Amino acid sequence: AALDALENIGLANAPKSGVEIMTGAGAILGEDGRLRFPRALVEDMLALAARDITLYGRDPKYDLELSGTRVYYGTAGAAVHIVDVEKREYRESTAKDLFNAAQLVHHLDNVHFFQRAMVCRDVTDNFLMDINTLYGCCAGTSKHVGTSFSDPSHVAGCFDLIHMMAGGEDKWRARPFVSNSNCFVVPPMKFAEESCITMEACIRAGMPILLLSAGQAGATAPAPLATAIVQAVAECLAGVVYVNAMAPGHPAIFGTWPFVSDLRTGAMSGGSGEQ
């Protein structure tokens, strides 16, 4: 069903660079501006896709081998508020909160990686927020880190910091210890142009990609969960084509992440059982 959706419906709003990359591999750009993906193209890209991926930590003892039946647990999300257990109040999250969370994860044996769990709301400049997010995560733990970038223009400056932490670009490329959590689609079945350009920059810089599709059943995805999953799989398969058309075998993780909407209010139900 997901392959049928890619072949017949396709995805809209790819950036110009993405259109060139994917049509060069065999995707078809329709007169309606949508990219469609023949079944054979998807199968070919899946054959090229990386299999036994290692997510490196700055300390090798925290390396994560993503193969076989191995299962790992970590943080996720981008919370903008936090419950302050000392002051007993609900407030905006800060850079210090992010650092504290990274330190906590570092000392929890059964939490294996740290994705940026909250937004540094006390840093108002977006570039400074991105670079302080990266620094706060890596300062708090030597486990593998996942982060995001709020604008494609911020990627280069953040990589200056990454190369500094790694001891040089060559050492970074040998053991990339940060991955890009990338919501490259805006469901239903549309690319997120700026996120795609960010993803391209991260691929060129050697950073693993977590391909995230976060549709909401009943809002940006069909209400029946089975069809919401079909949509999420189709969107992430489009991401696999995108990544491997650009850099065959580049480490990328299939991140279907369907949520559900509260149909009484229209709000996202982030902690729902459906997720």
Functional labels for PLM-detected ranges:
Residues S93-Q275:
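Helix-rich catalytic cores of soluble enzyme domains
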Residues A1-K96:
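Acidic/polar, glycine-rich intrinsically disordered N-terminal extensions of enzymes
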